[in-house]
């Protein structure tokens, strides 16, 4: 029995799509109850667990967003979970709210994928959100304009 990811030749669009799903699907049971955080275990991060879990939630979006933009059918079950997580994560009244950021905050760098989502898949990533959530997403992302960031790869 081979390793389905290792044995994937990654030669075609469908190969890459299949690999992304194979890597992200096992994360679904690790999502928090409101799906705004992803607990991958204990980390060596120098920031609190809730921020590490928000980071873990955001990283798969780098694959999910292009799949949404490319209208890949296989992304739908993944997107349903991440869509629910975004709604919870930007809601200040939700216990899984991603919170108020501070200068040099890890969550600032994670905001980039949300911009990519709105640019590449605006319908799914923004316009399909409830109006209240659109405003909350804007407010949460807008925090970046009021905080310092290191002069490194965070400032794309």
What name fits each language-model region?
Residues 69-71:
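Short, well-structured hydrophobic secondary-structure segments
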Residues 1-55, 77-85:
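Low-complexity, Ser/Thr/Pro/Gly-enriched N-terminal "stalk/linker" regions
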Residues 53-54, 64-66, 75, 79-156:
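Aromatic-lined, polymer-binding surfaces characteristic
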